[in-house]
Regions:
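N-terminal juxtadomain amphipathic helix
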Residues: 1-60
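Short, solvent-exposed coil/turn linker segments
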Residues: 3, 47-48, 70, 132-138
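Alpha-helix initiation/capping motif
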Residues: 14, 35, 66-70, 140
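Charge-dense, low-complexity intrinsically disordered segments
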Residues: 19, 64, 68, 156
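Residues that form generic nucleotide/phosphate-binding pockets
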Residues: 45, 68, 72, 84
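Conserved SAM-binding loop and adjacent beta-strand
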Residues: 62-76
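Conserved SAM-binding loop
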Residues: 76-183
Length: 183
C-alpha cells in the first residue's frame, strides 16, 4: 500500500470486538481493511449465527425477507450466467455461503464447484451440492483453465491478498470464460 490515509475507523461489534481502519489505497482507488486479518483466521470473523449468508435459518422477519430476496437474486444470477454460452458449463462460485446459487445452477445443468472458508456454511453447501464445496486452499488444486464462469457474489471485498487471488482465478478461467464480481 503506497499511502495509508485513514478513511474511517470501524469496530467489529458482531464477533471480535476489534477496531479496524478503512484505508484508501491511492494506487487502486479503493478502500482496504487495515490491518488485514490473517488468512487462516479469516473464517473466525464469520462465526456467528447472525451472519445471515452462512445459515438457512428463518427465525425472524429479517431472515425471512432475506430468503425471499435471495430467491429472486438467485434467478437473476442464473439468467445472467446462462446468457454466456458454454458447452461444458463449468462454474466456480467463490465464497458460496450455504451453496444456494450452486444448487440452482446444478439443477440447470451446470457442473459446479464452490469455495467457502466457513466450515458450517460449507457443510450446509455440501449437503445441497453433493459435496462440491471446498476450503479456500483447494483453489490451487483445480486444473488450469477449467471454468467457464467464476463468480464472486459480494465476496471480492472480503478477499485477503487480492492480487494473488485474482491471479489464481485468472488461471482457473477458460480463455473465453467470464468472471462475475458483485460488491
Amino acid at each position: 500500500m503506497k499511502d495509508k490515509s485513514i478513511f474511517l475507523k470501524v469496530k467489529d461489534h458482531s464477533v471480535s470486538g476489534e477496531t479496524f481502519q478503512l484505508i484508501k489505497n491511492e494506487t487502486y482507488g479503493f478502500l482496504e481493511t487495515f490491518p488485514q486479518p490473517e488468512e487462516q483466521k479469516l473464517s473466525e470473523y464469520y462465526k456467528t449465527e447472525d451472519y445471515i449468508s452462512h445459515t438457512d435459518s428463518k427465525r425472524n422477519l429479517l431472515e425471512k425477507a432475506y430468503h425471499v430476496v435471495r430467491n429472486i437474486s438467485l434467478k437473476r444470477k442464473l439468467k445472467l450466467i446462462n446468457s454466456f454460452e458454454s458447452e461444458e458449463k463449468n462454474l466456480l462460485d467463490v465464497g458460496c455461503g450455504t451453496g444456494d446459487f450452486l444448487k440452482v445452477a446444478q439443477l440447470n445443468n451446470w457442473q459446479v464447484s464452490g469455495i467457502e472458508p466457513n466450515e458450517q456454511a460449507r457443510q450446509i453447501a455440501n449437503q445441497k451440492t453433493n459435496n462440491m464445496v471446498f476450503e479456500t486452499e483447494q483453489l490451487s488444486n483445480f486444473e488450469k483453465h477449467s471454468f467457464d464462469v467464476i463468480s464472486l457474489w459480494h465476496v471480492f471485498e472480503h478477499l485477503p491478498k487480492l492480487h494473488a487471488h485474482i491471479s489464481i482465478l485468472k488461471n482457473l478461467l477458460k480463455v473465453n470464460g467470464t468472471l462475475f464480481i458483485a460488491v
